[in-house]
Design a protein with these regions (language model features):
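Soluble extramembrane regions of membrane proteins in the secretory/endomembrane system
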Residues: 1-315
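Conserved helix-loop functional segments at active or binding sites
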Residues: 64, 342, 401
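Short, Lys/Arg-rich N-terminal segment immediately upstream of the first membrane anchor
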Residues: 311-316, 354-360, 447
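Juxtamembrane/start-of-transmembrane alpha-helix segments at the extracytoplasmic/lumenal side
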Residues: 312-326
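Lipid-exposed faces of alpha-helical membrane segments in multi-pass integral membrane proteins
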Residues: 324-333, 462, 466, 470
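Juxtamembrane interface at the cytosolic side of transmembrane helices
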Residues: 328-371
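Alpha-helical transmembrane segments of integral membrane proteins
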Residues: 367-624
Length: 624
């Protein structure tokens, strides 16, 4: 089974799915598409550009492996990956059934002609009636070749988080124009609250295009096997419902076995999840496992082996342990910075930590904190409403910062928050200077000499490469990375390091402003621990409010009415912020306490974000 990911992700995001399939005994290739993760970007100007973004190449590679059954290859792709999988199916699978192919052989090789009614008949029977004995031997030899070719195409594909593929196209059978879809078993999985172009799960069940694929005039029923039929006269026939995937088995149901062998089955799943949980939710992954277990008739190999039930999933535990590793990496950098600060080269950078500026009774602080939370809420609303439109327009700028549009969503989110934060910090600085005579910028050592800033940058570089070394170790020994859900970092290609430097130009100012805001909020009458928690709460409050307005209301409406509507704010790419915003507050405070300056925390946070963007997202528009 080939597993692939969506836009601005890498194969790391779907490795949990791959692990669960592999635990059932499947050979699984988890593949990063062109321009994603460690895969090279294809030459966009090349007229031979692969519409599957490398997924077809991965499929061809699978066929070189001697230990797989080449007649039972499946594919599953999420979001953009589902489009890539659909493109690979179009490139690999025949639009002609075996009967169509043999009718064309009879027509083109043996000079036979057929009426429209006759091409609905069995080609073998027609050949037996019309061909001589010698011709029939030749016919059978050609048939064996065609049958082998069809058998070695993709057997099943799941379109995850999308509704692409398997649309009818016109072909010619024995001189007659008819409509056909790729000869391949097909499945779709679209969450009830799926955000984006595919729409919600429920809307797809009643969409005209989906009902046409399933050959039904009534809403498609989820988790039901449909057996579609070939037709020639323009009148689409009604498909046959074979049963619920939970109640019948391909190991014992003859009708399902026959339909799977003919590659005419369709099925759709609508789990109770959002777009980004298609590969992180239990229900969604359980459906993937169950589908391939049934369609490929395989679960841990030998029939005598006890199969592993699709409800037995362990990948989430591993992903939570990856989160522990991610946090440990961050705290490891903190520990190393403490050691480095004792070295005489860096000791001169140690500044006095200023006396706390705010207090619990500081009305200005609480008002500005509330304004920041409101700004976060409005920023979420803006970037989720505009999504893909938030890109750079000038060509040289797009080449200089060349990651795909989801990176721009993160950056513009940070820019807007930084702009709002700059206004709030400016107000706070002016207030404290006039009211208390305190220069906040000077006391937080934002204003310092260049040699100290250079040493902070050097220390941040040492910390970054130490973290990269930790990643290399866990990749080599355990094939893991620092990740949780959509949030993570991974190994990079050489050109990605240069990308990090380019992206740091625009990201560093946001963390300098953030560091000032966080550390100017230290309070005289509150211990540092509780104060950090307050700052983390302020940074996350607007995000949580947007989540409540968008998703909780959708969930409540669904629970009350059974109608699953589209969340008003499509987080999709913003889920990492639930970890990042409070984590960056924590790091900004800890690094400030160690150095007495906001610079080191800003450099380290910038390095983490650039590393995440340039390693774990994608650049498919420009060859690096």
């Amino acid at each position: 089974i080939l597993v692939t990911h969506g836009t601005s992700c890498s194969n790391s995001t779907v490795n949990g799915v791959a692990e669960e399939l592999a635990s059932r005994g499947f050979v699984v290739l988890s593949l990063s598409a062109y321009g994603s993760g460690s895969s090279e970007t294809q030459d966009v100007g090349d007229p031979r550009m692969d519409p599957s973004l490398g997924i077809y190449d991965g499929l061809q590679y699978l066929r070189t492996l001697q230990y797989i059954d080449k007649t039972r290859i499946g594919m599953v792709g999420h979001s953009q990956g589902s489009k890539n999988v659909a493109a690979a199916v179009d490139m690999d699978c025949s639009l002609y059934t075996l009967n169509d192919l043999m009718l064309n052989v009879l027509s083109e090789t043996f000079g036979q002609s057929f009426t429209l009614e006759e091409i609905s008949q069995d080609a073998d029977e027609l050949a037996a009636r019309r061909l001589s004995a010698d011709q029939l031997v030749h016919y059978q030899a050609i048939r064996a070749e065609k049958e082998a070719e069809l058998a070695n195409t993709v057997y099943a594909a799941m379109i995850l988080g999308g509704n692409w593929g398997f649309e009818e196209k016109e072909v010619s059978v024995a001189g007659h124009t008819v409509k056909r879809t790729p000869v391949c078993n097909a499945a779709w999985q679209i969450g009830l609250f799926n955000e984006g172009r595919a729409g919600t799960g429920q809307s797809n069940l009643v969409s005209e295009s989906m009902m046409e694929r399933f050959q039904t005039t009534s809403p498609v029923l989820p988790e039901i096997w449909y057996n579609t039929k070939t037709y020639n006269d323009g009148q689409r026939p009604a498909s046959e419902q074979l049963g619920d995937i939970r109640n019948i088995s391909s190991g014992s149901d003859a009708a399902l076995q026959s339909a799977l062998a003919q590659r005419t089955t369709h099925i759709i799943f609508t789990p109770n999840n959002t777009h980004a949980r298609d590969y992180f939710g239990r229900d969604a992954v359980q459906h993937i496992v169950k589908y391939f277990e049934q369609v490929l008739c395989y679960n841990r190999g030998d029939p005598a082996t006890v199969p592993l039930d699709s409800s037995r999933l362990e990948f989430l535990m591993g992903k939570h342990l990856n989160l522990v590793a991610l946090l440990s990496m961050c705290f490891g950098m903190l520990a190393l910075s403490g050691i480095l600060m004792r070295h005489k080269f860096f000791a001169g950078c140690k500044k006095e930590v200023c006396e706390p500026i705010a207090s619990k009774k500081s009305v200005v602080f609480w008002v500005l904190g509330a304004c920041y939370a409101a700004a976060t809420y409005l920023t979420v609303a803006f970037v989720t409403k505009n999504g893909p439109a938030l890109g750079f327009k000038t060509e040289w700028v797009k080449k200089f910062w060349s990651m795909d549009f989801t990176a721009n969503i993160h950056i513009i989110f940070m820019w807007i928050l930084a702009a709002c934060g700059l206004v709030l910090v400016s107000i706070y600085c002016v207030y404290n200077y006039k009211k208390h005579g305190r220069n906040v910028l000077k006391e937080l050592n934002f204003l310092t000499n260049f040699s100290h800033i250079a040493k902070y940058f050097l220390m941040a570089a040492i910390l970054f490469f130490s973290a990269y070394g930790m990643l290399t170790v866990i990749r080599f020994f355990f094939h893991q990375d620092f990740r949780f859900w959509d949030n993570g970092v991974k190994d990079m290609l050489p050109q990605n390091f240069l990308q990090c430097l380019r992206y740091s130009i625009m990201i560093l100012p946001t963390f300098l402003v953030g560091g000032l805001f966080v550390n100017a909020g230290r309070m005289k009458d509150m211990k540092d621990g509780p104060n950090v928690l307050v700052q983390m709460a302020i940074s996350s409050a607007g995000l949580l409010a947007a989540y409540a307005v968008s998703y909780l209301t959708a969930y409540i409406t669904y629970a009350q009415t059974g109608a699953a509507g589209l969340p008003c704010f499509a987080f999709v790419s913003l889920w990492p912020m639930f970890i990042n915003l409070p984590l960056f507050v924590l790091l900004a405070r800890f690094f400030y306490k160690q150095t007495g300056s906001v610079w080191l925390g800003a450099f380290v946070n910038t390095a983490i974000v650039c590393w995440s963007i340039c390693s774990a997202q994608s650049s498919t528009g420009y060859y690096l």
